[in-house]
A protein has these predicted regions:
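Helix-loop-helix
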Residues: 1-64, 106, 196-202, 210, ...
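Non-transmembrane, membrane-proximal soluble domains of secreted or membrane proteins
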Residues: 53, 57, 61-93, 100, ...
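Soluble non-transmembrane domains of integral membrane proteins
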Residues: 70-71, 78, 85-347
């Protein structure tokens, strides 16, 4: 190290030391910072302590007052909770509200629905299908009293009251003589929709005068109901609809949270085939939605909503809400909007994931009507899918035929293309070779792109069906051949041991329909590559990539619904049969003669061909100039 460098480092050190010395905090600043940190710590501790007090308040009240005389206990409760004191202590009991399709249990503690079972459905292991029970749900309103006390309805004991309607249950929270808060639940026969009404009577001096809304906390765990946990979890999400606007949802693949300042029409906790939806006629305000992914166990996700609903303190108007406890069946969900104006429609059918844009349109106006129509006459859904596949293939036949004719033209012209390849060998003559090949196709009336367009036009239907089959609740628990349930995978071999990489992506089983789909796709790929070989040089690795695609489908679809893989298997088989029929019914000699006749006709170039040739000439000129420049060097 030379002298100048050493002096430089010493000066840098002196500057840094001086900067630190002159900018160090004063004792007063250090003391202020310490007091600030202590105050923050005290606030955080107080918040944690208050939260713990709120969580244990009910239990502490019951434990501390259990052995006291009634008069003393009433006095203590009155001091702590005012007019809600008596409702803080009680014995939990349940009232059942049910019809032929839904069974609900309403707890007197909190006056809430704490249990919901769908009678017409079972889980994958044939147990009753329960959407949630008391431990897996919470539904609480926060009440602010006239004396600024904060009380949670989940801590209060309501009293069941018999009404005039046998299909209704009234849970009443008494707050004094002539004043009470009523939660009314009404369930009509054969209906999945529960009307939920909140009405206060004589609460002017009970609740805070500024009360015009009630803060709501709604929590629910989403149980695993289907056989494939990973596959089901892809469809579990928290959906919500804006007032007179579209439906959106939180992330399906990870934990998510969102604050929504706009009013919401409804909030839905959606499983793969079933949903719990809370609907408000007036709308939910200042909503925060949370979705927590649970990687293991019987619970897939935990949903949480904090929001507020309008409330009339004068008791003149009720707060009208509704619950939907039921299946994600498109026709059923759509029926709730029958005869309703566009502004008031619920759009609950958007809980069914049918794709977006044109794919949803194809499902809504073609696939589902066709599926429902066939379902009126055919009760074996394996046969129904077979007939549906045949109908789709018949509809797509003109496009399929046009695509095959295009490949046949390319095939009969292959010898002439090979002659062009021999005439212009090497990379330096690639432009001449391409130009001559395009001229051949143009004169003969063939186009490499004419076979792509028909395939492209088929994609909306193919993608729509990909979205439809896993979402069709009609396939749930429907067996066909070896598949016990067409809504989940059909394992012919399975194992319990966790295998890294394989288990997370492939699963611990082998689906037979998926395997058959893969085999038929490999066969079709091999046959199609041989039939569509035009003699042109292919990109390196293209052949290997074509064979890799079916193997990737095996990994991707192994955990998908067997109804979907069965459809793809049948569809590929029909495509192979169609190709063989085309192959042996089309006279390629006559086709070649027709193309040769086209070559002798005056050639009329399309605008596209003219632009293509101009681009080729420009490329060729650029390449020629580059080669000349290299020679001069």
């Amino acid at each position: 190290m030379d002298k100048n460098t050493l002096i430089g480092f010493l000066l840098i050190g002196v500057v840094l030391f001086a900067f630190s010395w002159f900018n160090r905090p004063t004792p007063e600043q250090l003391e202020a910072q310490r007091r600030y940190q202590d105050s923050i710590a005290k606030i955080e501790y107080a918040q944690q302590l208050e939260l713990q007090k709120q969580e244990n308040k009910s239990a502490l009240v019951e434990d501390s007052l259990e052995n006291l005389p009634d008069s003393v206990r009433a006095q203590r409760l009155q001091q702590s909770f005012g007019v809600f004191g008596e409702a803080m202590v009680g014995t939990e009991d349940y009232t059942t509200l049910q019809n032929d399709v839904v069974e609900l249990r309403i707890s007197n503690k909190g006056g809430r629905i704490c249990y919901a079972r769908l009678k017409e459905y079972d889980t994958y292991n044939d147990e009753p299908l329960v959407l949630f029970d008391e431990k897996e749900s919470n539904f609480n309103f926060t009440l602010v009293t006239a004396t600024n006390r904060v009380v949670n309805t989940s801590d209060l004991y309501f009293t069941p009251v018999k009404g005039n309607d046998p299909n209704s249950v009234i849970m009443r929270l008494n707050t004094g003589e002539g004043s009470h808060l009523d939660f009314t639940y009404t369930l009509k026969p054969d209906d999945y929709m529960v009307q939920y009404q909140i009405l206060g009577t004589g609460l002017n001096g009970v609740l805070a005068p500024s009360t015009n809304a009630l803060d709501l906390l709604w929590e629910q765990d989403i149980r695993q109901q289907e056989k494939g946990r990973k596959f089901e979890d892809r469809y579990v999400t928290l959906n919500y609809k804006f007032m007179a606007d579209d439906v959106e949802h939180l992330s399906e693949s990870k934990s998510d949270s969102k604050q929504i300042p706009n009013r919401l029409k409804w909030i839905g906790y959606k499983d793969m085939f079933f949903s719990t939806v809370l609907i408000s006629q007036e709308g939910f305000e200042a909503t925060t939605l949370d979705s927590k992914a649970i990687p293991e166990g019987d619970v897939l996700k935990q949903f949480k909503t904090t929001t507020s609903v309008p409330f009339d303190l004068q008791g003149k108007e009720a707060t009208n809400l509704s619950f939907y406890f039921g299946p994600n069946k498109f026709a059923l969900l759509k029926s709730f909007d029958k005869g309703v104006s566009a502004e008031q429609q619920l759009d609950l059918e958007k809980l069914v994931p049918l794709g977006w844009g044109i794919f949803r349109w194809v499902n809504q106006y073609f696939v589902i009507p066709l599926f429902d129509f066939l379902g009126k006459f055919i009760h074996n859904y394996g046969i129904l899918i077979l007939l549906m596949t045949i109908i789709v293939k018949i509809i797509l036949f003109p496009l399929t035929y046009k695509s095959y004719m295009s490949s046949a033209k390319m095939r009969v012209l292959r010898p002439q293309v090979e002659e062009i390849n021999a005439k212009y060998p090497g990379q330096d003559k690639a432009m001449e070779r391409q130009k001559a090949t395009m001229e051949l196709y143009s004169r003969a009336g063939a186009s490499p792109m004419s076979g792509c367009l028909p395939m492209l036009l088929q994609m909306p239907i193919l993608i729509a069906l990909f979205m439809f089959f896993p979402s069709a609740i009609e396939l749930r628990h429907q067996s066909f051949l070896w598949a016990h349930d067409l809504s989940t995978y059909d394992a012919i071999f399975s194992w319990n041991k966790y295998i890294p990489i394989i288990t997370p992506y492939f699963g611990n089983h082998i689906s037979l329909f998926c395997l058959l789909m893969t085999i038929t796709n490999i066969f079709y790929t091999k046959y199609n590559m041989e039939m569509t070989n035009t003699g042109q040089q292919q990109m390196p690795g293209m052949k290997a990539m074509m064979y890799m695609m079916p193997l990737m489908f095996l990994v991707f679809f192994n955990q998908y619904a067997s109804g979907l893989t069965y459809y793809y298997f049948i569809s590929t088989l029909i495509t192979i049969v169609q190709t063989l029929i085309f192959r042996y019914t089309i006279n390629e000699d006559k086709l070649l003669a027709k193309l040769e006749a086209n070559k002798r006709k005056p050639m009329k170039k399309s605008g596209f061909m003219k632009r293509l040739e101009e681009a080729q000439r420009a490329q060729q000129e650029t390449l020629r100039k580059q080669q000349e420049a290299k020679k001069k060097r």
